[in-house]
């Protein structure tokens, strides 16, 4: 049940509670006034998991209206008094006037009152002085009517229990109201009063249940004056809009109000029974407030019980309910797998989500040549379920209102004519609530979905771990859009596969959903993968945004609470972040700032040349790596050596998310440079690389260094272990560079100055790259090391045309600002620099001249 404290809350008069937890103000021998009977409805012929009440069954039930609509329930306890919940009458700690409220009595349907129904204005509202919020108790209120109610068969007061009254644990009681029939699912027209049977739970049992991890990762301390009712397995409960209504129990032919609907965590969730205000606890306070009213509420003596009420044991253990969904004997043997058979079409794969409903893609049933509704002649349709001796017939097809061939709402629900008896062989998959947060690293697996071919290879190809939200959103989300925080619906869910994909395979004809496991329970997490060409699915539309629709249609789908909660500031970002810009070819240059040292430089490649040397490479596009020519080709060589490229390696270890990728090099492309051997080489890979946190292209910038960028040389500390290290550098202006090297440098050569203590961080034989991070977060490749120098790099910008023409998918960002280095002649070189080429002292002297030269 949605937390009732989220309702519009109003209250007016505050009054103390003398002796709130004391026994009755009357002795057990005192009798109530004879002129007021209570708790005896006239004989007659939602609430989560409930049903329509018969007219006149609950004549004390009232509807409290504010602003023209039903807000809360209440109970008539005397002709001039109504009992309800305090939280209904308070908004942000402010008490609202009683004159803004009205009470409807004798109402069965909010769409059409019964004979005898009438409305009364509210003269005063009284709440306990110590009420502050529902979790702290004292959640009750008394409403004094402006004029007495007209009593009759449809309007009659309920009995109230004395402080000494003891309701037996396990007693079947009834809650009533016009609240939501499920979370975020209002009671439909004609708004008939709902009733549901709930079992009273002892305080120790309730506390044990609420001490277990559950919805929203919250626990609760059950306080004196609180009462619990419901079932460990959930599915029957009060909900939003039922607040203030009565929980009544029959004893000796009378109905006593045991509780006032107060709050809960969700509606009908497992191991989260509803929490009610225990009316008996507040007998003295109620008597004090209504003193002088004639007739007042009736507190009859408790009828003699037929058996004693044993004291509930105080042990901390309790029998918790386990999920009834999502259990499979092994991955791939899914007991919820369903095949919808439509004459003349290939089977459509879906999933059993309740005893009576199957979820499948709506596109299976749409005519590609028509925008009309799917055919409604369902007599010939059949559904095949695991271990079922016969095919199930289809009674109804319900499409999502936004269903189409290629969007996130490509969903339909099929109702079976005969409900399935659930067993280990046939059970539904669990569905996530909207706030569900699938943890990075969760174990996931692809499952067939819709019409399509099966997997191309062993089942291990279907196994994956879930990427973190930042990576997934920035790879496949909208650039510049804020990354959803944990608990907010994500834009996409992204698997990182554990098994390397077979070279040359194509998954274009297969269709998949994404199942993810928590504590041994499988959830249908994602549906309809994003288009990925021949690659395995890279991203899925999250299902949790559709949970309310599925729940509304089925009224019984197994939406299950999150079962794994070990996340927080150390696991995933909890502050709002945005994604760097994309290019026309997609995301590039992404790196998580909090990445551990030595990992997650997703464009950094190891280029193994003919078994005798390893060069640094940079992934420019899914099928291309850039490296320094002098490292990958021997001087004078014209043949392509055997070269293998590795991505996603931090020394000897694979990255924790996204795993080692290897490709062969099938060709080497060099630009045409007159008279000189070009410093840069493009390596064409044998097949494209799946984009992931361990293999993602870097961005390129066509016009020098954007203002504000910070730059680094990225290489390896030792060539044998190849653990990545980054050395901070400043890129010198072209004028200083020309001064230092007397104009002997090839055009487009960059000079760098290492930060103090950074000179020897990287070994240079592998020709490391020069990178810069732009202010908005993107990383760009600026240059590759020149042979024999630690300070010189071949610039990428001048080769923009060649790279774009050769690669096609190179990620050049739009030019921003002006180049970092100004143009200028070497005739202005200070004499000290002109004589200092190669001298370390000259390099440090540059620090003193930086401001002068830049001016």
Swiss-Prot record:
<feature type="disulfide bond">
    <location>
        <begin position="239"/>
        <end position="267"/>
    </location>
</feature>
<dbReference type="InterPro" id="IPR017326">
    <property type="entry name" value="Pept_S1A_polyserase-2"/>
</dbReference>
<feature type="disulfide bond">
    <location>
        <begin position="739"/>
        <end position="751"/>
    </location>
</feature>
<feature type="domain" description="Peptidase S1 2">
    <location>
        <begin position="323"/>
        <end position="555"/>
    </location>
</feature>
<dbReference type="GO" id="GO:0005576">
    <property type="term" value="C:extracellular region"/>
</dbReference>
<feature type="glycosylation site" description="N-linked (GlcNAc...) asparagine">
    <location>
        <position position="92"/>
    </location>
</feature>
<keyword id="KW-0378">Hydrolase</keyword>
<feature type="glycosylation site" description="N-linked (GlcNAc...) asparagine">
    <location>
        <position position="508"/>
    </location>
</feature>
<feature type="disulfide bond">
    <location>
        <begin position="506"/>
        <end position="534"/>
    </location>
</feature>
<dbReference type="InterPro" id="IPR001314">
    <property type="entry name" value="Peptidase_S1A"/>
</dbReference>
<feature type="disulfide bond">
    <location>
        <begin position="173"/>
        <end position="249"/>
    </location>
</feature>
<dbReference type="InterPro" id="IPR018114">
    <property type="entry name" value="TRYPSIN_HIS"/>
</dbReference>
<feature type="region of interest" description="Disordered">
    <location>
        <begin position="292"/>
        <end position="316"/>
    </location>
</feature>
<dbReference type="GO" id="GO:0005737">
    <property type="term" value="C:cytoplasm"/>
</dbReference>
<feature type="compositionally biased region" description="Polar residues">
    <location>
        <begin position="301"/>
        <end position="310"/>
    </location>
</feature>
<feature type="glycosylation site" description="N-linked (GlcNAc...) asparagine">
    <location>
        <position position="130"/>
    </location>
</feature>
<feature type="glycosylation site" description="N-linked (GlcNAc...) asparagine">
    <location>
        <position position="369"/>
    </location>
</feature>
<feature type="disulfide bond">
    <location>
        <begin position="444"/>
        <end position="516"/>
    </location>
</feature>
<keyword id="KW-0964">Secreted</keyword>
<feature type="disulfide bond">
    <location>
        <begin position="615"/>
        <end position="631"/>
    </location>
</feature>
<keyword id="KW-0272">Extracellular matrix</keyword>
<feature type="active site" description="Charge relay system">
    <location>
        <position position="243"/>
    </location>
</feature>
<dbReference type="GO" id="GO:0006508">
    <property type="term" value="P:proteolysis"/>
</dbReference>
<dbReference type="InterPro" id="IPR009003">
    <property type="entry name" value="Peptidase_S1_PA"/>
</dbReference>
<feature type="domain" description="Peptidase S1 3">
    <location>
        <begin position="590"/>
        <end position="808"/>
    </location>
</feature>
<feature type="glycosylation site" description="N-linked (GlcNAc...) asparagine">
    <location>
        <position position="421"/>
    </location>
</feature>
<dbReference type="InterPro" id="IPR001254">
    <property type="entry name" value="Trypsin_dom"/>
</dbReference>
<feature type="domain" description="Peptidase S1 1">
    <location>
        <begin position="47"/>
        <end position="291"/>
    </location>
</feature>
<dbReference type="GO" id="GO:0004252">
    <property type="term" value="F:serine-type endopeptidase activity"/>
</dbReference>
<feature type="disulfide bond">
    <location>
        <begin position="711"/>
        <end position="772"/>
    </location>
</feature>
<keyword id="KW-0325">Glycoprotein</keyword>
<dbReference type="InterPro" id="IPR043504">
    <property type="entry name" value="Peptidase_S1_PA_chymotrypsin"/>
</dbReference>
<keyword id="KW-0732">Signal</keyword>
<keyword id="KW-0720">Serine protease</keyword>
<feature type="glycosylation site" description="N-linked (GlcNAc...) asparagine">
    <location>
        <position position="317"/>
    </location>
</feature>
<comment type="similarity">
    <text>Belongs to the peptidase S1 family.</text>
</comment>
<feature type="disulfide bond">
    <location>
        <begin position="348"/>
        <end position="364"/>
    </location>
</feature>
<feature type="glycosylation site" description="N-linked (GlcNAc...) asparagine">
    <location>
        <position position="402"/>
    </location>
</feature>
<feature type="glycosylation site" description="N-linked (GlcNAc...) asparagine">
    <location>
        <position position="217"/>
    </location>
</feature>
<feature type="disulfide bond">
    <location>
        <begin position="72"/>
        <end position="88"/>
    </location>
</feature>
<keyword id="KW-0865">Zymogen</keyword>
<dbReference type="Pfam" id="PF00089">
    <property type="entry name" value="Trypsin"/>
</dbReference>
């Amino acid at each position: 049940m949605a937390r009732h404290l989220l309702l519009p809350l109003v209250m007016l008069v505050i009054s103390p509670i003398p002796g709130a937890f004391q026994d009755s103000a009357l002795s057990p021998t005192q009798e109530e006034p004879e002129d007021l009977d209570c708790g005896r409805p006239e004989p007659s012929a939602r609430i989560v998991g409930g049903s329509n009440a018969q007219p006149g069954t609950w004549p004390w039930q009232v509807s409290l209206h504010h602003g023209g609509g039903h807000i809360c329930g209440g109970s008539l306890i005397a002709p001039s008094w109504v009992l309800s919940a305090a939280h209904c009458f308070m908004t942000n700690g402010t008490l609202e006037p009683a004159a803004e409220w009205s009470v409807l009595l004798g109402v069965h349907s909010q769409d059409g009152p019964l004979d005898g129904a009438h409305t009364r204005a509210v003269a005063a509202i009284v709440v306990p002085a110590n009420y502050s919020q529902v979790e702290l108790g004292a959640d009750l209120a008394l409403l004094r009517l402006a004029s007495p109610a007209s009593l009759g068969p449809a309007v009659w007061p309920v009995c109230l229990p004395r402080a000494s009254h003891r309701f037996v644990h396990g007693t079947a009681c009834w809650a009533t109201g016009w609240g939501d029939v499920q979370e975020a699912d209002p009671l439909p027209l004609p708004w008939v009063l709902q009733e549901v049977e709930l079992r009273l739970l002892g305080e120790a049992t309730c506390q044990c249940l609420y001490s277990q991890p559950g919805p929203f990762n919250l626990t609760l301390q059950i306080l004196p004056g609180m009462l619990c009712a419901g079932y460990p397995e959930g599915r029957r409960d009060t909900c939003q809009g039922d607040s203030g209504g009565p929980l009544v129990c029959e004893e000796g032919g009378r109905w006593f109000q045991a509780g006032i609907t107060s709050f809960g965590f969700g509606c009908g969730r497992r191991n989260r029974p509803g929490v009610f205000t225990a009316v008996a606890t507040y007998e003295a306070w109620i008597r004090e407030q209504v003193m002088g009213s004639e007739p007042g509420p009736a507190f009859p003596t408790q009828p003699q019980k037929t058996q004693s009420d044993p004291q509930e044991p105080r042990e901390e253990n309790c029998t918790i309910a386990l999920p009834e969904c999502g259990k499979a004997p092994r991955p791939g043997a899914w007991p919820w797998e369903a095949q919808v058979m439509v004459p003349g079409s290939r089977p459509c794969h879906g999933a059993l989500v309740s005893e009576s409903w199957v979820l499948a893609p709506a596109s299976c049933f749409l005519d590609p040549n028509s925008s009309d509704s799917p055919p409604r002649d369902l007599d010939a349709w059949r559904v095949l379920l695991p271990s079922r001796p016969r095919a199930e017939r289809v009674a109804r097809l319900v499409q999502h209102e936004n269903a189409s061939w290629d969007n996130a709402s490509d969903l339909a629900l099929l109702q079976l004519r005969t409900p399935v008896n659930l067993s280990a062989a046939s059970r539904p998959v669990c569905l996530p609530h909207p706030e569900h947060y699938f943890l990075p690293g969760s174990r996931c697996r692809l499952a067939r979905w819709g019409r399509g071919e099966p997997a191309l290879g062993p089942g291990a190809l279907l196994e994956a771990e879930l990427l973190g939200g930042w990576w997934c959103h920035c790879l496949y989300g909208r650039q510049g859009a804020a990354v959803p925080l944990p608990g907010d619906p994500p834009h996409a869910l992204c698997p990182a596969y554990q098994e390397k994909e077979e070279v040359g395979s194509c998954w274009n004809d297969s269709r998949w959903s994404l199942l993810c496991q928590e504590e041994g329970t499988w959830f249908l997490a994602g549906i309809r993968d994003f288009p990925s060409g021949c690659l395995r699915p890279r991203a899925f539309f999250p299902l949790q945004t559709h949970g309310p629709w599925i729940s509304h249609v089925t009224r019984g789908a197994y939406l299950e609470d999150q079962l794994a909660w070990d996340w927080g500031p150390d696991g995933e970002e909890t502050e709002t972040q945005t994604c760097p810009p994309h290019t026309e070819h997609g995301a590039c240059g992404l790196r998580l700032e909090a990445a551990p040292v030595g990992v997650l430089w997703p464009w950094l490649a190891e280029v193994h040349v003919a078994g005798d040397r390893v060069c640094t490479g940079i992934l420019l596009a899914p099928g291309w790596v850039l490296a320094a020519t002098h490292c990958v080709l021997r001087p004078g060589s014209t043949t392509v050596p055997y070269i293998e490229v590795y991505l996603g390696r931090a020394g000897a270890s694979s990255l924790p998310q996204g795993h080692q990728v290897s490709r062969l090099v099938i060709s080497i492309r060099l630009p045409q440079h007159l008279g000189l051997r070009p410093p840069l080489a493009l390596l064409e890979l044998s097949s494209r690389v799946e984009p992931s946190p361990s293999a993602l292209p870097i961005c390129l910038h066509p016009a020098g260094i954007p203002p504000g960028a910070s730059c680094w040389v990225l290489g390896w500390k030792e060539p044998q272990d190849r653990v990545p290290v980054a050395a901070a550098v400043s890129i010198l202006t072209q004028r200083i560079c020309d001064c230092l090297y007397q104009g002997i440098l090839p055009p487009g050569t960059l000079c760098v100055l290492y930060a103090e203590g950074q000179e020897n961080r990287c070994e240079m034989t592998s020709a490391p790259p020069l990178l810069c991070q732009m202010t908005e977060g993107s990383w760009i490749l600026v240059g590759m090391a020149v042979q024999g120098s630690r300070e010189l790099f071949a610039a990428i910008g001048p080769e923009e045309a060649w790279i774009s023409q050769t690669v096609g998918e190179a990620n050049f960002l739009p030019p921003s600002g002006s180049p970092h280095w100004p143009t200028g002649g070497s005739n202005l070189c200070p004499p000290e620099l002109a004589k200092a080429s190669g001298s370390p002292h000259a390099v440090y002297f540059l620090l003193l001249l930086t401001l002068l030269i830049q001016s």
